[in-house]
């Protein structure tokens, strides 16, 4: 009888250890899902036609001077949907100089994303948006050479190459 009680106690301890392991795993999965939801990782439009990459480039307006391009330009049809690359809050929505119709989203982990040259905007400052939600439509507003989306990613206020997150 003592052997059975000892075995039962041992099995109970093993079950409690497995339960703790599963709870830790569940916590890790939830944290990873949260990180993925609020980190820019969704390509912001249906086209993958990058016409201007992040970094140094020849100025597309004069064809010879060099300039720094803080994002990627993605050619697409005028009016194609633009999606939030991660869940977050709309920090800015409206006209923003050379960016034309522009949206800036704030995300967790210090990330912000910016979307420029749109034809129309469908979200307002202060609004919460989910990853993949339509926030506007591709256009050619502002200082632009044709219909495309200008897309930027910043982390803690510093420009980063969007390609490393997509």
Residue ranges and their predicted role:
Residues 42-166:
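Catalytic cores of peptidoglycan-degrading enzymes
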Residues 1-46:
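Non-catalytic extracellular/periplasmic "stalk"
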């Amino acid at each position: 009888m003592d052997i059975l009680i000892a075995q039962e106690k041992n099995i109970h301890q093993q079950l409690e250890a497995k339960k703790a392991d599963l709870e830790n795993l569940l916590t890790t999965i939830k944290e990873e899902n949260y990180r993925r939801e609020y980190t820019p990782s969704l390509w912001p439009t249906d086209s993958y036609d990058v016409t201007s990459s992040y970094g140094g480039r020849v100025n597309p307006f004069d064809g010879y001077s060099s300039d720094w391009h803080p994002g990627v330009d993605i050619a697409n049809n005028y009016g194609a949907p633009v999606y939030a690359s991660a869940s977050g809050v709309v920090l800015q929505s409206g006209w923003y100089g050379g960016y034309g119709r522009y949206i800036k989203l704030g995300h967790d982990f210090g990330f912000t994303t910016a979307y420029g040259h749109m034809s129309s905007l469908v979200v307002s400052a202060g609004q919460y948006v989910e990853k993949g939600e339509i926030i506007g439509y591709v256009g050619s507003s502002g200082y632009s050479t044709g219909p495309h989306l200008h897309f930027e990613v910043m982390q803690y206020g510093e420009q980063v190459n969007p390609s490393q997150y997509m």
